[in-house]
């Protein structure tokens, strides 16, 4: 699966709107993940998982920074995500299904925060983009 030129443009345009709110978007995405899929909390036993905690905000920002880096490397995603894939596969040993769960929570957060901008075309492009990211992040599991 690859992104078409118009999908890349949609993703980059939406990212420009999101980048300034990276920390709150990332935090809200994690809070949605932990609320909707409580089993994902097991990967964060050392975190304060209360609403708006410093650790949630920091990790949310880290996730969104990685998403932003992926947007910047949209034409070479595999190379851009190699270290992140290795970290999650070999060191953190995150169940690959969690990438899809996080992706879904990010899409819901985007829709809630940008209702006028989150058109069906934006939804489709970002869903495809996050599916590609999830797939790349699970490559090292094979």
Swiss-Prot record:
Q: Which GO terms describe its molecular function?
A: heme binding; iron ion binding; oxygen binding; oxygen carrier activity
Q: Which residues form the Globin domain?
A: 2-142
> Which Pfam families did the record assign?
Globin
Per UniProt, the keywords (alphabetical) are:
Acetylation, Heme, Iron, Metal-binding, Oxygen transport, Phosphoprotein, Transport
Question: Which InterPro entries does this chain map to?
Answer: Globin (IPR000971), Globin-like_sf (IPR009050), Globin/Proto (IPR012292), Hemoglobin_a-typ (IPR002338), Hemoglobin_oxygen_transport (IPR050056), Hemoglobin_zeta (IPR002340)
Q: Which residues cross the membrane?
A: none
Cellular component per GO, a single term: hemoglobin complex
Q: Which residues carry this modification: Phosphoserine?
A: 53, 73
Q: Which residues carry this modification: N-acetylserine?
A: 2
Q: Which residues carry this modification: Phosphothreonine?
A: 29
Q: Which residues bind heme b?
A: 59, 88
Gene3D superfamilies associated with the record: Globins (1.10.490.10)
Q: Which GO terms describe its biological process?
A: carbon dioxide transport; erythrocyte maturation; negative regulation of transcription by RNA polymerase II; oxygen transport
Q: What does this protein do?
A: The zeta chain is an alpha-type chain of mammalian embryonic hemoglobin.
Subunit annotation: Heterotetramer of two zeta chains and beta-type chains.
Family recorded in the similarity comment = Belongs to the globin family.
Q: Would you tell me the protein name for this molecule?
A: Hemoglobin subunit zeta
Species per Swiss-Prot/TrEMBL record: Mus musculus
Gene encoding the protein: Hbz
